[in-house]
């Protein structure tokens, strides 16, 4: 694949930024629970909000990059604190703040996101 894309694997619990077939960064990722699954498929980052707070749950969602309805890639203090215990409400949780900031800084709106099993 040519260009830059964000790929996320539910099975491997990882997210990558890939440029022209070369992995630029790999981050641990936590996905939605069975009742609120993360949408699989090819999506596009349509909105970014560095200091987003969930209007539904009141939770801080730093470095949010929205790709499908209300689902976003964002930092999760819960994931950072509790690890793999738990799940999101459909978002892709990242526990490495500095790694996510690196990704945020290099991800414009319009960037392709591919979520797969």
Feature locations, PLM:
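Exported/periplasmic cell-wall-interacting domains
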Residues: 1-3, 36-42, 47-117
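Cell wall/extracellular polymer interaction/catalysis modules
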Residues: 1-42, 62-63
